[in-house]
From Swiss-Prot:
<comment type="similarity">
    <text>Belongs to the peroxiredoxin family. AhpC/Prx1 subfamily.</text>
</comment>
<keyword id="KW-0346">Stress response</keyword>
<protein>
    <recommendedName>
        <fullName>Alkyl hydroperoxide reductase C</fullName>
        <ecNumber>1.11.1.26</ecNumber>
    </recommendedName>
</protein>
<keyword id="KW-1015">Disulfide bond</keyword>
<keyword id="KW-0963">Cytoplasm</keyword>
<keyword id="KW-0560">Oxidoreductase</keyword>
<comment type="subunit">
    <text>Homodimer; disulfide-linked, upon oxidation. 5 homodimers assemble to form a ring-like decamer.</text>
</comment>
<dbReference type="GO" id="GO:0005737">
    <property type="term" value="C:cytoplasm"/>
</dbReference>
<keyword id="KW-0575">Peroxidase</keyword>
<keyword id="KW-0049">Antioxidant</keyword>
<keyword id="KW-0676">Redox-active center</keyword>
<dbReference type="GO" id="GO:0102039">
    <property type="term" value="F:NADH-dependent peroxiredoxin activity"/>
</dbReference>
<comment type="function">
    <text>Thiol-specific peroxidase that catalyzes the reduction of hydrogen peroxide and organic hydroperoxides to water and alcohols, respectively. Plays a role in cell protection against oxidative stress by detoxifying peroxides.</text>
</comment>
Length: 25
């Protein structure tokens, strides 16, 4: 389950709008 996957706040693959997008904020 992606919901329970631990992710880093600045380099993470976020599930957005039905697709995977790389988040680098």
């Amino acid at each position: 389950s992606l919901i329970n996957t631990e992710v880093k706040p600045f380099q993470a693959t976020a599930y957005h709008n039905g697709q995977f997008v790389e988040v680098n904020e």
